[in-house]
Amino acid sequence: MAGGMSVDTRRWCFADQLGPHFLDAPDQPVLLIESRSAFERRRFHRRKAHLVLSALRHRAAELGDQATFLQTRTYREALDQLDEPVSVCQPTSWAADRFIRSIPRIPKIEVLPARGFCTDRATFADWAEAHPTLKLENFYRDARRRLDLLMDGNQPAEGRWNFDADNREPAPTSSDGLGVGPPWRPDEDEIDEQVRADLDRWERDGDVSFVGRDGPREFAVTATEAQSALKVFLRDRLPHFGPHEDAMLSGDRFMAHSLLSAPMNLGLLDPLDCAYAAEDAYRSGQAPLGSVEGYIRQLIGWRDYIWHVYWHFGRGYRRRNALEAHGRLPKWFADLDSDAVEAHCLKDILAQVRDHGWVHHIPRLMVLSNYALQRGWNPAAVTDWFHRCFVDGYEWVMVANVVGMSQHADGGLMATKPYTSGGAYINRMSDYCGECKYRPSQRVGDRACPFTGGYWWFLDRNAKHLANNQRMNQPLAGLRRLRDLDDVVKQQRRLGGRAP
């Protein structure tokens, strides 16, 4: 590796490094590469492909002559055209990191530390050495202190670190929902039109195949657009964010969520800037502390934590399968065929993924991931599905979220217990169950909720794996008291991979 290159050295920016904070100077020369093979290897959501290409091409248009923009089939074809040294911020996946370090012309490439996160890898490594259990809450509080966010001297603002207990209110019963203003929305332009035409042609020619439906672009693809989206969130939506952040409404897929994960994961927003902007909203009286703390926790806590866990546990982490779940994703799920589903929550949420490539974190965790965990689907396949089907999905995002959090495939390295529940949780936190053919209180019979029966089936299959987990003592004791367990298991096995 060459070291100490100047700001005149061309900066190679990947398609998730498109913001100004990935450059050392506003006028630094830039290399952008559009590689079609990235879309040939996997069946991505159509909206995800559009978003990535639109963002890359918009960045090239913004930079003009400052950028060398190469559109090739592979990255190597593009790099073969280079005759100058480049620098690059560390990529966000093991595969991309290995690739840039294996390019033959090593002396002409300088790999810089990663950007786009609030805590650097060296700092996390020091913290992890001192905190081997890797508890998120400890990491989050350390980040609050270190970054001086929501702190009054040495103490947290208003004397509280955590407003999770206040931010778990169920879905409102009012027909007006949350009564929150709409999120920011972009206007498409000629670049979007050309991206759509190119994707249509590639698919027509058989070069690529997509899942999901096309539609108007819904997320920011430039730093300017992303700042506009952030401004609308801080002004109109952040004040309402906290209390219902864990709730679901069938008629309101956005609720008060920011919808900033997609532009942030494209590198268009610096998460630390967003966190300080949210704190400013609290300090100026524009948003309550509970909502601001909940949002900042997602940025400097959860998002950074997921990033660091991905690297900390190594390349083999994505293949962990502690519960020995080997089931294949059924075709209806893999293809986002919500029409095959009758369970109201799963049907509606799968349709949202099909049509938009996005739902907020609770439908992801407590409906989609919960169902996959209960069915015993292979966690690597579930990870790949989330990566491909969500506009904000990337390798680093989904490996720890799925393997560690939602599928408990790491055996508890990250989460202390499996995140699974029966229909009662969905009934309490959403408005889905009232119009559903299934009853959340029933685990056997024609109207048995697939999540309720699935919950007990999951516990029965994995009782030995979970026997030494103290947090599972109560659920396993409940399992032993079930008189109709054999009937539950038989019914769930009959359902198998069929859509519920």
Mark where each language-model region is.
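N-terminal beta-strand-loop-alpha-helix module at the start
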Residues: 1-70
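C-terminal catalytic domain of photolyase/cryptochrome flavoproteins
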Residues: 3, 14-18, 247, 251-500
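Short His-Asn-centered micro-motif
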Residues: 12-16, 33-34, 70-73, 88-91, ...
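Short, solvent-exposed loop/turn segments at secondary-structure junctions
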Residues: 17-19, 37-38, 93-94, 116-117, ...
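Short helix/loop capping segments that flank catalytic or ligand/cofactor-binding pockets
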Residues: 21-22, 40-42, 96, 242, ...
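A generic secondary-structure signal
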Residues: 59-62, 81-82, 102, 277, ...
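Beta-rich, aromatic/charged-enriched effector core domains that present basic-aromatic interfaces
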Residues: 75-219, 403
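A charged, amphipathic alpha-helical module
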Residues: 158-290
